[in-house]
From Swiss-Prot:
It comes from Arabidopsis thaliana (Mouse-ear cress). Residues 90-115 have a biased composition (Acidic residues). This is Histone acetyltransferase GCN5. One of its GO terms (molecular function) is histone H4 acetyltransferase activity. Residues 1-167 are annotated as: Disordered. The keyword Aminoacyl-tRNA synthetase does not apply.
Amino acid sequence: MDSHSSHLNAANRSRSSQTPSPSHSASASVTSSLHKRKLAATTAANAAASEDHAPPSSSFPPSSFSADTRDGALTSNDELESISARGADTDSDPDESEDIVVDDDEDEFAPEQDQDSSIRTFTAARLDSSSGVNGSSRNTKLKTESSTVKLESSDGGKDGGSSVVGTGVSGTVGGSSISGLVPKDESVKVLAENFQTSGAYIAREEALKREEQAGRLKFVCYSNDSIDEHMMCLIGLKNIFARQLPNMPKEYIVRLLMDRKHKSVMVLRGNLVVGGITYRPYHSQKFGEIAFCAITADEQVKGYGTRLMNHLKQHARDVDGLTHFLTYADNNAVGYFVKQGFTKEIYLEKDVWHGFIKDYDGGLLMECKIDPKLPYTDLSSMIRQQRKAIDERIRELSNCQNVYPKIEFLKNEAGIPRKIIKVEEIRGLREAGWTPDQWGHTRFKLFNGSADMVTNQKQLNALMRALLKTMQDHADAWPFKEPVDSRDVPDYYDIIKDPIDLKVIAKRVESEQYYVTLDMFVADARRMFNNCRTYNSPDTIYYKCATRLETHFHSKVQAGLQSGAKSQ
Protein backbone atom coordinates (compact mmCIF):
# COMPACT_ATOMS: atom_id res chain seq x y z
CA MET A 1 0.00 0.00 0.00
CA ASP A 2 1.22 3.45 -0.80
CA SER A 3 0.70 4.77 2.70
CA HIS A 4 3.11 2.21 3.98
CA SER A 5 5.80 2.58 1.37
CA SER A 6 9.30 3.04 2.60
CA HIS A 7 9.59 6.62 1.48
CA LEU A 8 11.89 7.57 4.35
CA ASN A 9 15.32 5.97 4.25
CA ALA A 10 15.54 5.35 7.96
CA ALA A 11 17.73 2.57 9.22
CA ASN A 12 16.02 -0.58 10.47
CA ARG A 13 15.92 -0.84 14.23
CA SER A 14 15.08 -3.78 16.37
CA ARG A 15 12.69 -3.31 19.23
CA SER A 16 15.34 -4.23 21.72
CA SER A 17 17.36 -1.18 20.75
CA GLN A 18 14.55 1.25 21.24
CA THR A 19 13.77 3.04 24.44
CA PRO A 20 10.17 2.43 25.54
CA SER A 21 8.16 5.58 25.44
CA PRO A 22 4.98 6.44 27.29
CA SER A 23 3.30 6.65 23.93
CA HIS A 24 3.36 2.92 23.20
CA SER A 25 5.40 3.52 20.10
CA ALA A 26 8.06 1.27 18.67
CA SER A 27 8.61 3.24 15.51
CA ALA A 28 11.76 4.84 14.19
CA SER A 29 13.08 7.98 15.87
CA VAL A 30 11.57 11.31 15.01
CA THR A 31 13.58 13.74 12.98
CA SER A 32 13.66 16.66 15.32
CA SER A 33 15.03 19.41 13.12
CA LEU A 34 13.20 21.13 10.31
CA HIS A 35 16.11 20.52 7.96
CA LYS A 36 15.92 16.78 8.46
CA ARG A 37 12.22 16.73 7.77
CA LYS A 38 12.65 18.61 4.50
CA LEU A 39 15.52 16.34 3.53
CA ALA A 40 13.46 13.22 4.31
CA ALA A 41 10.57 14.60 2.29
CA THR A 42 12.87 15.22 -0.68
CA THR A 43 14.14 11.66 -0.44
CA ALA A 44 10.57 10.37 -0.25
CA ALA A 45 9.75 12.05 -3.55
CA ASN A 46 12.18 9.72 -5.31
CA ALA A 47 10.71 6.51 -3.85
CA ALA A 48 8.30 4.49 -5.96
CA ALA A 49 5.21 3.40 -4.06
CA SER A 50 2.77 0.75 -5.16
CA GLU A 51 -0.85 1.88 -5.23
CA ASP A 52 -2.41 -1.29 -3.92
CA HIS A 53 0.40 -3.39 -2.41
CA ALA A 54 2.90 -2.69 0.33
CA PRO A 55 6.61 -3.14 -0.20
CA PRO A 56 8.11 -6.38 1.07
CA SER A 57 9.45 -4.83 4.24
CA SER A 58 9.29 -1.58 6.13
CA SER A 59 12.11 0.62 7.22
CA PHE A 60 10.12 1.38 10.36
CA PRO A 61 9.65 -1.15 13.11
CA PRO A 62 6.10 -1.89 14.16
CA SER A 63 4.53 0.62 16.44
CA SER A 64 2.60 -0.56 19.39
CA PHE A 65 0.22 0.02 22.24
CA SER A 66 2.47 -0.36 25.24
CA ALA A 67 1.48 -1.62 28.66
CA ASP A 68 1.67 1.90 30.07
CA THR A 69 -1.08 3.15 27.81
CA ARG A 70 -3.09 4.64 30.59
CA ASP A 71 -0.23 6.63 31.92
CA GLY A 72 1.30 7.90 28.71
CA ALA A 73 1.02 11.57 27.90
CA LEU A 74 0.27 12.89 24.45
CA THR A 75 0.22 16.56 23.61
CA SER A 76 -1.36 18.23 20.67
CA ASN A 77 -0.70 21.16 18.42
CA ASP A 78 3.00 20.84 18.96
CA GLU A 79 3.61 21.11 15.25
CA LEU A 80 1.19 24.00 14.83
CA GLU A 81 2.82 25.85 17.70
CA SER A 82 6.18 25.63 15.98
CA ILE A 83 4.66 26.87 12.73
CA SER A 84 2.99 29.73 14.55
CA ALA A 85 6.18 30.66 16.34
CA ARG A 86 8.13 30.71 13.12
CA GLY A 87 5.45 32.84 11.51
CA ALA A 88 5.68 35.34 14.32
CA ASP A 89 9.45 35.55 14.27
CA THR A 90 9.99 35.65 10.53
CA ASP A 91 8.37 37.11 7.45
CA SER A 92 7.85 33.72 5.87
CA ASP A 93 4.56 33.04 4.18
CA PRO A 94 2.14 30.68 5.95
CA ASP A 95 2.16 28.51 2.84
CA GLU A 96 5.85 27.83 3.37
CA SER A 97 5.20 26.68 6.91
CA GLU A 98 2.55 24.30 5.76
CA ASP A 99 4.86 22.91 3.12
CA ILE A 100 7.23 21.96 5.89
CA VAL A 101 4.63 19.85 7.65
CA VAL A 102 2.95 18.32 4.62
CA ASP A 103 6.06 17.94 2.46
CA ASP A 104 5.60 14.20 2.09
CA ASP A 105 1.98 14.52 1.17
CA GLU A 106 2.75 16.89 -1.67
CA ASP A 107 5.37 14.56 -3.10
CA GLU A 108 3.24 11.50 -2.79
CA PHE A 109 0.04 13.01 -4.07
CA ALA A 110 1.54 15.33 -6.66
CA PRO A 111 -1.17 14.56 -9.26
CA GLU A 112 -3.85 15.63 -6.81
CA GLN A 113 -3.34 19.36 -6.88
CA ASP A 114 -6.70 20.09 -5.28
CA GLN A 115 -5.67 18.26 -2.11
CA ASP A 116 -2.40 20.14 -1.75
CA SER A 117 -3.95 23.52 -2.36
CA SER A 118 -6.82 22.85 0.01
CA ILE A 119 -4.48 21.86 2.83
CA ARG A 120 -2.28 24.93 2.32
CA THR A 121 -5.28 27.25 2.04
CA PHE A 122 -6.90 25.76 5.11
CA THR A 123 -3.77 25.96 7.26
CA ALA A 124 -2.91 29.47 6.15
CA ALA A 125 -6.40 30.71 6.91
CA ARG A 126 -6.39 28.97 10.27
CA LEU A 127 -3.03 30.41 11.27
CA ASP A 128 -4.00 33.91 10.14
CA SER A 129 -7.32 33.92 11.98
CA SER A 130 -6.23 32.23 15.17
CA SER A 131 -4.34 35.22 16.58
CA GLY A 132 -7.40 37.45 16.86
CA VAL A 133 -9.81 35.23 18.75
CA ASN A 134 -10.65 36.44 22.27
CA GLY A 135 -7.46 38.43 22.33
CA SER A 136 -5.39 35.29 22.83
CA SER A 137 -2.06 34.73 21.16
CA ARG A 138 -1.69 32.50 18.14
CA ASN A 139 0.10 29.84 20.13
CA THR A 140 -2.57 29.72 22.81
CA LYS A 141 -5.35 29.38 20.27
CA LEU A 142 -3.63 26.58 18.47
CA LYS A 143 -3.06 24.69 21.68
CA THR A 144 -6.73 24.78 22.48
CA GLU A 145 -7.84 23.60 19.05
CA SER A 146 -5.65 20.59 18.65
CA SER A 147 -5.61 19.07 22.06
CA THR A 148 -4.25 15.58 22.03
CA VAL A 149 -5.92 12.26 21.81
CA LYS A 150 -5.28 9.29 24.03
CA LEU A 151 -6.38 5.70 23.75
CA GLU A 152 -6.87 3.48 26.75
CA SER A 153 -5.59 -0.01 26.74
CA SER A 154 -8.70 -1.34 28.32
CA ASP A 155 -10.75 -2.41 25.34
CA GLY A 156 -9.73 -2.85 21.99
CA GLY A 157 -9.61 -3.56 18.41
CA LYS A 158 -11.68 -6.44 17.40
CA ASP A 159 -12.02 -4.76 14.08
CA GLY A 160 -9.68 -6.46 11.95
CA GLY A 161 -6.56 -7.06 10.39
CA SER A 162 -3.73 -5.13 9.06
CA SER A 163 -0.34 -4.26 10.38
CA VAL A 164 0.06 -1.39 12.77
CA VAL A 165 2.43 1.21 11.43
CA GLY A 166 2.32 3.80 14.13
CA THR A 167 -0.05 2.57 16.72
CA GLY A 168 0.26 4.43 19.97
CA VAL A 169 -2.06 4.67 22.91
CA SER A 170 -1.67 7.66 25.09
CA GLY A 171 -2.07 11.36 25.03
CA THR A 172 -1.27 14.71 26.46
CA VAL A 173 -3.27 16.72 28.78
CA GLY A 174 -4.77 19.35 26.61
CA GLY A 175 -7.32 22.04 27.24
CA SER A 176 -8.31 21.04 30.74
CA SER A 177 -9.43 24.56 31.55
CA ILE A 178 -11.41 25.16 28.38
CA SER A 179 -14.75 26.81 29.02
CA GLY A 180 -17.95 25.04 28.14
CA LEU A 181 -16.81 21.58 29.21
CA VAL A 182 -18.84 19.66 31.77
CA PRO A 183 -17.10 19.30 35.14
CA LYS A 184 -15.45 15.97 35.76
CA ASP A 185 -17.43 15.53 38.99
CA GLU A 186 -20.52 14.60 37.01
CA SER A 187 -18.79 11.71 35.25
CA VAL A 188 -17.28 10.55 38.53
CA LYS A 189 -20.72 10.58 40.14
CA VAL A 190 -22.21 8.50 37.35
CA LEU A 191 -19.38 5.98 37.60
CA ALA A 192 -19.82 5.70 41.36
CA GLU A 193 -23.54 5.01 41.01
CA ASN A 194 -23.09 2.15 38.55
CA PHE A 195 -19.77 0.65 39.61
CA GLN A 196 -21.01 -1.57 42.44
CA THR A 197 -23.98 -3.07 40.61
CA SER A 198 -22.79 -3.09 37.02
CA GLY A 199 -19.04 -3.53 37.11
CA ALA A 200 -16.33 -1.14 35.95
CA TYR A 201 -16.75 -1.79 32.23
CA ILE A 202 -20.52 -1.24 32.13
CA ALA A 203 -20.24 1.78 34.41
CA ARG A 204 -17.73 3.51 32.13
CA GLU A 205 -19.56 2.59 28.94
CA GLU A 206 -22.91 3.85 30.22
CA ALA A 207 -21.38 7.06 31.56
CA LEU A 208 -19.85 7.83 28.16
CA LYS A 209 -23.05 6.78 26.42
CA ARG A 210 -24.96 9.36 28.45
CA GLU A 211 -22.44 12.01 27.47
CA GLU A 212 -22.96 11.06 23.82
CA GLN A 213 -26.71 11.35 24.18
CA ALA A 214 -26.33 14.73 25.87
CA GLY A 215 -24.15 15.96 23.01
CA ARG A 216 -21.03 16.47 25.09
CA LEU A 217 -19.19 13.67 23.29
CA LYS A 218 -19.19 12.94 19.59
CA PHE A 219 -17.61 10.12 17.61
CA VAL A 220 -16.87 10.90 13.97
CA CYS A 221 -15.01 9.29 11.09
CA TYR A 222 -13.09 11.71 8.86
CA SER A 223 -10.62 11.37 6.04
CA ASN A 224 -8.74 13.80 3.82
CA ASP A 225 -11.74 15.18 1.92
CA SER A 226 -10.60 18.85 1.82
CA ILE A 227 -13.42 19.96 4.14
CA ASP A 228 -12.03 22.55 6.54
CA GLU A 229 -13.73 21.18 9.65
CA HIS A 230 -12.50 17.68 8.92
CA MET A 231 -8.99 18.88 8.16
CA MET A 232 -8.82 20.78 11.44
CA CYS A 233 -9.66 17.60 13.34
CA LEU A 234 -7.12 15.61 11.35
CA ILE A 235 -4.37 18.12 12.06
CA GLY A 236 -5.25 18.07 15.75
CA LEU A 237 -5.11 14.30 15.68
CA LYS A 238 -1.82 14.43 13.80
CA ASN A 239 -0.31 16.50 16.60
CA ILE A 240 -1.49 13.94 19.11
CA PHE A 241 0.16 11.12 17.21
CA ALA A 242 3.33 13.17 16.76
CA ARG A 243 3.63 13.75 20.48
CA GLN A 244 2.50 10.28 21.42
CA LEU A 245 4.88 8.54 19.05
CA PRO A 246 8.17 10.38 19.55
CA ASN A 247 10.15 7.78 17.61
CA MET A 248 7.93 8.04 14.55
CA PRO A 249 8.92 10.68 11.98
CA LYS A 250 6.27 13.36 11.82
CA GLU A 251 6.35 13.37 8.05
CA TYR A 252 5.45 9.69 8.07
CA ILE A 253 2.53 10.33 10.44
CA VAL A 254 1.29 13.14 8.19
CA ARG A 255 1.65 10.98 5.13
CA LEU A 256 -0.53 8.19 6.48
CA LEU A 257 -3.01 10.44 8.22
CA MET A 258 -3.55 12.59 5.12
CA ASP A 259 -3.58 9.65 2.74
CA ARG A 260 -7.05 9.57 1.24
CA LYS A 261 -7.12 5.81 1.54
CA HIS A 262 -6.89 6.09 5.31
CA LYS A 263 -9.73 6.96 7.66
CA SER A 264 -9.67 8.28 11.21
CA VAL A 265 -12.32 7.59 13.85
CA MET A 266 -12.13 10.36 16.45
CA VAL A 267 -13.80 11.23 19.72
CA LEU A 268 -14.58 14.92 20.20
CA ARG A 269 -15.52 16.68 23.42
CA GLY A 270 -17.11 19.84 22.22
CA ASN A 271 -14.76 21.00 19.47
CA LEU A 272 -11.76 19.40 21.12
CA VAL A 273 -10.20 16.20 19.81
CA VAL A 274 -9.84 13.77 22.70
CA GLY A 275 -8.69 10.66 20.88
CA GLY A 276 -8.54 8.88 17.57
CA ILE A 277 -7.64 5.78 15.59
CA THR A 278 -6.33 5.90 12.03
CA TYR A 279 -6.77 2.83 9.86
CA ARG A 280 -6.85 1.77 6.24
CA PRO A 281 -9.72 -0.42 5.03
CA TYR A 282 -9.14 -2.94 2.26
CA HIS A 283 -12.68 -3.29 1.02
CA SER A 284 -11.98 -5.98 -1.55
CA GLN A 285 -10.20 -8.12 1.06
CA LYS A 286 -12.62 -7.27 3.90
CA PHE A 287 -9.93 -6.44 6.44
CA GLY A 288 -8.46 -3.26 7.85
CA GLU A 289 -5.08 -2.05 9.03
CA ILE A 290 -4.81 0.08 12.15
CA ALA A 291 -2.07 2.67 11.77
CA PHE A 292 -2.17 4.98 14.81
CA CYS A 293 -4.15 5.24 18.01
CA ALA A 294 -3.94 7.70 20.92
CA ILE A 295 -5.95 9.43 23.66
CA THR A 296 -5.14 12.49 25.75
CA ALA A 297 -3.47 11.85 29.10
CA ASP A 298 -6.03 13.68 31.22
CA GLU A 299 -8.82 11.57 29.74
CA GLN A 300 -7.22 8.19 30.33
CA VAL A 301 -8.67 5.43 32.49
CA LYS A 302 -12.14 6.78 31.79
CA GLY A 303 -13.15 4.37 29.08
CA TYR A 304 -12.50 6.60 26.07
CA GLY A 305 -10.18 4.05 24.52
CA THR A 306 -12.75 1.29 24.89
CA ARG A 307 -15.56 3.41 23.55
CA LEU A 308 -13.44 4.65 20.66
CA MET A 309 -12.45 1.13 19.66
CA ASN A 310 -16.05 -0.03 19.88
CA HIS A 311 -17.11 2.76 17.51
CA LEU A 312 -14.27 1.80 15.18
CA LYS A 313 -15.42 -1.82 15.11
CA GLN A 314 -19.00 -0.91 14.42
CA HIS A 315 -18.08 1.60 11.72
CA ALA A 316 -15.62 -0.76 10.04
CA ARG A 317 -18.21 -3.54 10.00
CA ASP A 318 -21.33 -1.57 9.05
CA VAL A 319 -19.84 1.04 6.71
CA ASP A 320 -16.66 -0.54 5.32
CA GLY A 321 -17.87 -4.13 5.37
CA LEU A 322 -14.74 -5.37 7.17
CA THR A 323 -14.55 -8.67 9.01
CA HIS A 324 -11.01 -8.60 10.44
CA PHE A 325 -8.25 -6.36 11.69
CA LEU A 326 -4.56 -7.20 11.55
CA THR A 327 -1.79 -5.39 13.36
CA TYR A 328 1.89 -5.73 14.15
CA ALA A 329 2.71 -5.39 17.84
CA ASP A 330 5.96 -5.28 19.72
CA ASN A 331 6.49 -6.77 23.17
CA ASN A 332 4.98 -3.78 24.92
CA ALA A 333 1.86 -3.93 22.79
CA VAL A 334 0.91 -7.60 22.94
CA GLY A 335 -0.84 -7.32 26.30
CA TYR A 336 -2.90 -4.38 25.13
CA PHE A 337 -4.04 -6.02 21.93
CA VAL A 338 -5.00 -9.20 23.76
CA LYS A 339 -7.38 -7.10 25.85
CA GLN A 340 -8.87 -5.74 22.66
CA GLY A 341 -9.69 -9.21 21.37
CA PHE A 342 -6.60 -9.74 19.24
CA THR A 343 -4.99 -13.16 19.05
CA LYS A 344 -1.46 -14.24 18.23
CA GLU A 345 -2.82 -16.92 15.92
CA ILE A 346 -3.72 -15.67 12.45
CA TYR A 347 -6.83 -17.47 11.24
CA LEU A 348 -7.37 -15.25 8.22
CA GLU A 349 -6.07 -16.95 5.10
CA LYS A 350 -2.66 -15.63 4.13
CA ASP A 351 -3.72 -15.08 0.52
CA VAL A 352 -6.24 -12.51 1.76
CA TRP A 353 -3.77 -10.17 3.45
CA HIS A 354 -0.28 -11.11 2.26
CA GLY A 355 1.15 -8.35 0.06
CA PHE A 356 -1.34 -5.76 1.30
CA ILE A 357 0.31 -5.04 4.62
CA LYS A 358 3.94 -4.43 5.43
CA ASP A 359 6.17 -6.92 7.17
CA TYR A 360 8.12 -5.65 10.18
CA ASP A 361 11.27 -7.03 11.71
CA GLY A 362 10.70 -7.97 15.34
CA GLY A 363 6.96 -7.35 15.28
CA LEU A 364 4.27 -9.85 16.20
CA LEU A 365 1.37 -10.03 13.77
CA MET A 366 -1.96 -10.20 15.60
CA GLU A 367 -5.50 -10.66 14.37
CA CYS A 368 -8.92 -9.63 15.60
CA LYS A 369 -12.18 -10.87 14.12
CA ILE A 370 -15.13 -8.50 14.09
CA ASP A 371 -18.29 -10.18 15.29
CA PRO A 372 -21.06 -9.78 12.70
CA LYS A 373 -23.84 -9.41 15.29
CA LEU A 374 -22.44 -7.77 18.42
CA PRO A 375 -23.78 -4.24 19.07
CA TYR A 376 -20.36 -2.78 19.78
CA THR A 377 -21.66 0.69 20.66
CA ASP A 378 -24.34 -0.74 22.96
CA LEU A 379 -22.50 -3.60 24.64
CA SER A 380 -23.34 -2.33 28.12
CA SER A 381 -27.08 -2.75 27.52
CA MET A 382 -26.58 -6.23 26.13
CA ILE A 383 -24.42 -7.27 29.09
CA ARG A 384 -26.93 -5.82 31.53
CA GLN A 385 -29.77 -7.79 29.93
CA GLN A 386 -27.73 -10.99 29.99
CA ARG A 387 -26.83 -10.47 33.62
CA LYS A 388 -30.45 -9.83 34.52
CA ALA A 389 -31.55 -13.02 32.77
CA ILE A 390 -28.90 -15.07 34.60
CA ASP A 391 -29.85 -13.56 37.97
CA GLU A 392 -33.51 -14.37 37.39
CA ARG A 393 -32.64 -17.95 36.52
CA ILE A 394 -30.47 -18.29 39.63
CA ARG A 395 -33.30 -17.00 41.80
CA GLU A 396 -35.56 -19.71 40.41
CA LEU A 397 -33.12 -22.40 41.54
CA SER A 398 -31.77 -20.84 44.73
CA ASN A 399 -32.68 -18.55 47.60
CA CYS A 400 -29.27 -16.89 47.65
CA GLN A 401 -30.94 -13.49 47.46
CA ASN A 402 -32.15 -13.89 51.06
CA VAL A 403 -29.93 -12.13 53.60
CA TYR A 404 -30.21 -13.20 57.25
CA PRO A 405 -29.14 -11.22 60.32
CA LYS A 406 -25.65 -11.85 61.61
CA ILE A 407 -24.91 -14.02 64.59
CA GLU A 408 -22.95 -13.08 67.69
CA PHE A 409 -19.66 -15.00 67.79
CA LEU A 410 -17.21 -14.00 70.54
CA LYS A 411 -13.72 -15.49 70.87
CA ASN A 412 -11.11 -15.82 73.60
CA GLU A 413 -7.43 -14.97 73.22
CA ALA A 414 -6.55 -18.19 71.37
CA GLY A 415 -9.48 -17.82 69.00
CA ILE A 416 -11.60 -20.26 71.02
CA PRO A 417 -15.32 -19.43 70.89
CA ARG A 418 -16.80 -18.34 74.22
CA LYS A 419 -20.12 -19.89 73.38
CA ILE A 420 -20.66 -22.98 71.29
CA ILE A 421 -22.96 -22.30 68.36
CA LYS A 422 -24.56 -25.30 66.78
CA VAL A 423 -24.31 -25.36 63.03
CA GLU A 424 -27.99 -26.13 62.62
CA GLU A 425 -28.77 -22.88 64.48
CA ILE A 426 -27.27 -20.75 61.71
CA ARG A 427 -30.19 -19.28 59.81
CA GLY A 428 -30.40 -20.08 56.13
CA LEU A 429 -27.92 -22.95 56.26
CA ARG A 430 -30.49 -25.72 55.92
CA GLU A 431 -32.28 -23.72 53.21
CA ALA A 432 -29.02 -23.60 51.29
CA GLY A 433 -28.87 -27.41 51.24
CA TRP A 434 -26.77 -28.18 54.31
CA THR A 435 -27.31 -31.54 56.02
CA PRO A 436 -26.01 -32.73 59.42
CA ASP A 437 -23.75 -35.35 57.84
CA GLN A 438 -21.67 -32.53 56.37
CA TRP A 439 -20.56 -31.40 59.83
CA GLY A 440 -16.83 -31.75 60.36
CA HIS A 441 -16.16 -32.72 56.75
CA THR A 442 -12.47 -33.49 56.30
CA ARG A 443 -10.23 -34.78 53.56
CA PHE A 444 -8.64 -37.11 56.12
CA LYS A 445 -10.47 -40.40 56.65
CA LEU A 446 -10.08 -40.86 60.39
CA PHE A 447 -12.47 -43.22 62.05
CA ASN A 448 -15.51 -45.39 61.55
CA GLY A 449 -18.00 -43.46 59.50
CA SER A 450 -20.88 -45.30 61.17
CA ALA A 451 -20.06 -43.88 64.61
CA ASP A 452 -21.96 -40.87 65.88
CA MET A 453 -20.56 -37.36 65.75
CA VAL A 454 -19.75 -37.21 69.46
CA THR A 455 -17.69 -40.40 69.33
CA ASN A 456 -15.80 -39.23 66.27
CA GLN A 457 -15.00 -35.90 67.92
CA LYS A 458 -13.63 -37.65 71.02
CA GLN A 459 -11.40 -39.84 68.88
CA LEU A 460 -10.24 -36.76 66.95
CA ASN A 461 -9.37 -34.90 70.17
CA ALA A 462 -7.38 -37.90 71.40
CA LEU A 463 -5.41 -38.06 68.16
CA MET A 464 -4.64 -34.32 68.22
CA ARG A 465 -3.43 -34.54 71.86
CA ALA A 466 -1.11 -37.37 70.89
CA LEU A 467 0.25 -35.46 67.91
CA LEU A 468 0.73 -32.32 70.00
CA LYS A 469 2.67 -34.28 72.65
CA THR A 470 4.99 -35.78 70.03
CA MET A 471 5.83 -32.27 68.82
CA GLN A 472 6.33 -30.87 72.32
CA ASP A 473 8.64 -33.73 73.28
CA HIS A 474 10.75 -33.50 70.14
CA ALA A 475 14.30 -32.16 70.47
CA ASP A 476 13.71 -29.50 67.79
CA ALA A 477 10.53 -28.10 69.37
CA TRP A 478 12.23 -25.56 71.63
CA PRO A 479 11.90 -22.55 69.26
CA PHE A 480 8.14 -23.07 68.98
CA LYS A 481 7.02 -23.64 72.58
CA GLU A 482 6.38 -19.95 73.34
CA PRO A 483 5.30 -16.94 71.26
CA VAL A 484 8.11 -14.84 69.82
CA ASP A 485 8.99 -11.94 72.13
CA SER A 486 8.85 -8.66 70.20
CA ARG A 487 11.42 -7.17 72.58
CA ASP A 488 13.96 -9.73 71.39
CA VAL A 489 12.89 -9.64 67.74
CA PRO A 490 11.37 -6.17 67.08
CA ASP A 491 10.46 -6.67 63.43
CA TYR A 492 9.03 -10.20 63.71
CA TYR A 493 5.39 -9.16 63.77
CA ASP A 494 5.94 -6.72 60.93
CA ILE A 495 6.91 -9.65 58.71
CA ILE A 496 4.78 -12.45 60.19
CA LYS A 497 1.18 -11.26 60.10
CA ASP A 498 -0.45 -14.49 61.33
CA PRO A 499 1.77 -15.91 64.12
CA ILE A 500 1.18 -19.28 65.78
CA ASP A 501 3.09 -21.43 68.28
CA LEU A 502 2.71 -24.68 70.22
CA LYS A 503 1.30 -22.88 73.25
CA VAL A 504 -1.63 -21.47 71.27
CA ILE A 505 -2.19 -24.80 69.53
CA ALA A 506 -2.28 -26.54 72.93
CA LYS A 507 -4.95 -24.15 74.22
CA ARG A 508 -7.09 -24.79 71.16
CA VAL A 509 -6.73 -28.56 71.51
CA GLU A 510 -7.63 -28.50 75.21
CA SER A 511 -10.75 -26.42 74.57
CA GLU A 512 -12.14 -29.23 72.39
CA GLN A 513 -14.14 -26.55 70.60
CA TYR A 514 -11.74 -25.03 68.10
CA TYR A 515 -10.49 -27.94 65.97
CA VAL A 516 -13.56 -29.64 64.54
CA THR A 517 -11.50 -31.37 61.84
CA LEU A 518 -7.97 -32.70 61.61
CA ASP A 519 -7.42 -30.36 58.65
CA MET A 520 -7.61 -27.33 60.95
CA PHE A 521 -5.06 -28.80 63.35
CA VAL A 522 -2.63 -29.72 60.56
CA ALA A 523 -3.06 -26.27 58.97
CA ASP A 524 -2.01 -24.52 62.20
CA ALA A 525 1.06 -26.73 62.53
CA ARG A 526 2.10 -26.07 58.93
CA ARG A 527 1.63 -22.34 59.39
CA MET A 528 3.95 -22.45 62.40
CA PHE A 529 6.68 -24.13 60.35
CA ASN A 530 6.17 -21.82 57.35
CA ASN A 531 6.34 -18.70 59.54
CA CYS A 532 9.69 -19.87 60.89
CA ARG A 533 11.11 -20.47 57.43
CA THR A 534 9.72 -17.15 56.17
CA TYR A 535 11.46 -15.08 58.82
CA ASN A 536 14.72 -17.03 59.16
CA SER A 537 17.30 -17.77 56.49
CA PRO A 538 18.03 -21.41 55.51
CA ASP A 539 21.41 -21.46 57.24
CA THR A 540 19.97 -20.68 60.70
CA ILE A 541 19.24 -23.24 63.41
CA TYR A 542 15.61 -22.10 63.55
CA TYR A 543 15.04 -22.87 59.88
CA LYS A 544 16.58 -26.34 60.27
CA CYS A 545 14.54 -27.05 63.41
CA ALA A 546 11.34 -26.20 61.57
CA THR A 547 12.17 -28.54 58.70
CA ARG A 548 13.08 -31.47 60.98
CA LEU A 549 10.08 -31.00 63.26
CA GLU A 550 7.72 -30.76 60.30
CA THR A 551 9.05 -34.03 58.88
CA HIS A 552 8.54 -35.70 62.25
CA PHE A 553 5.03 -34.26 62.59
CA HIS A 554 3.86 -35.46 59.19
CA SER A 555 5.20 -38.95 59.82
CA LYS A 556 3.20 -39.13 63.05
CA VAL A 557 0.05 -37.87 61.31
CA GLN A 558 0.32 -40.63 58.72
CA ALA A 559 0.98 -43.22 61.42
CA GLY A 560 -2.05 -42.05 63.38
CA LEU A 561 -4.30 -42.25 60.32
CA GLN A 562 -3.07 -45.75 59.49
CA SER A 563 -3.60 -47.01 63.03
CA GLY A 564 -7.08 -45.53 63.05
CA ALA A 565 -7.89 -47.30 59.80
CA LYS A 566 -6.64 -50.65 61.20
CA SER A 567 -8.74 -50.26 64.34
CA GLN A 568 -11.83 -50.10 62.15
